[in-house]
Amino acid sequence: MRVAIVTETYPPEINGVALTVAGLARGLKAGGHTVQIIRPRQPGFDKEPAQNDDFLVRGMRIPRYPGLRFGLPARRKIETLWKSGRPDAVYVATEGPLGSSALQAAQALRIPACSGFHTRFDEFARYYGLGWITPLVLAYLRRFHGRSIKTLVPTSELADFLRDKGFDNVELLRRAVDTRLFSPERRSLKLRREWGLGEDRLAVIYVGRIAAEKNLDLAVRAFRAIQAQRKDARFVWVGDGPARAGLQSHNPDFIFSGMQRGEALAAHYASGDLFLFPSLHETFGNVTLEAMASGVPAVAFDYGAAREHLCDACGRRIAYNDEAAFIAAAVELARDDAARHPMRTLARNAVAALDPSHVCANFAAVLGGLKVGSAA
């Protein structure tokens, strides 16, 4: 099967959508399918002409997020491309101008297309004090996904939410986690020593974008409460983003490791003892699965990946937006090394079945079953 994947974010950009889409592309290729990626050009990385089969279009920087871009409309170019080499199916991963162009092109050429719902833009609007536009955002997303035959989502919770908001043909496609990469075996005493920690001291970690919408003030308050009980604790931040400079200047005792990839990222996860994920606005939250696969107990709110996979045997799942309970759970787990130790194995076991090959096989089956004219 020849598949075109359209996305406005892709590695080397680091975010949940980029890494998820790249994983799906790898899985399709491993299954013998041909994959064409259509995405914005990434200045400083992409060469002229493209060094692989990717089809690159013009993009623009996203305000306040250096390093991230959205693709400009490119319907005519995409139609020309697909007329010369028609894909059997199209997957549109992002809802920007490029994704919209791709759905229009697929409709015009009667190529079956499905879409992915990866980001809760409606929640972002509320967070930035623009709650009044939430109905407009949802209306746009409903129209966008209404042009695809199916909309793929990572959790049953999100599927129910979208159906309740009038989205049609929503289908579950669970997320995978690479348990060969993310593993307790990556734990590194050398790395912990670089953090100023031996095995008997506590490393609290956060992995993800360092941005206002991630609710990071709660993570800071939770750590300060931990620190009041355990003077030996250190807080390690893995990632980057617009809030990093301010966070770093106000908290000089925190350790900022910057962006990490591959085995280095896996070592950072596995070398931690407790993972804090305070975000309230994730569509899923891949980092929770990666922490669990690495054998690190997590504290996260009860939605997305945490609702699907986290339990009290391997961390703490907290009632949505209950900040006091989040802090209390973080302190409880930080204080009790003996209780945390068995959680490492149980957290790993809880996600062991989320093998990328199974998820990608399901994805290929969805794409192969798409029929033009079957969208509502």
What name fits each language-model region?
Residues P297-A300:
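Short hydrophobic beta-strand element within catalytic cores of glycosyltransferases
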Residues L197-K214, V220-R224:
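Conserved donor-binding/catalytic core segment of Leloir-type glycosyltransferases
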Residues W82, M259-Q260, A267-G272, F363:
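Short alpha-helical donor nucleotide-sugar binding micro-motif in glycosyltransferases
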Residues R39, L56-R58, L138-R187:
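Donor nucleotide-sugar binding/catalytic pocket of nucleotide-sugar-dependent glycosyltransferases
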Residues F124, L172, L289, Y303-I318:
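Short acidic/histidine- and often glycine-rich active-site loop of Leloir-type glycosyltransferases
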Residues R244-A264:
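Nucleotide-activated donor-binding/catalytic signature segment of Leloir-type glycosyltransferases, i.e.
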Residues D312, R316-A324, E332-D337:
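Conserved acidic donor-binding segment of nucleotide-sugar-dependent glycosyltransferases
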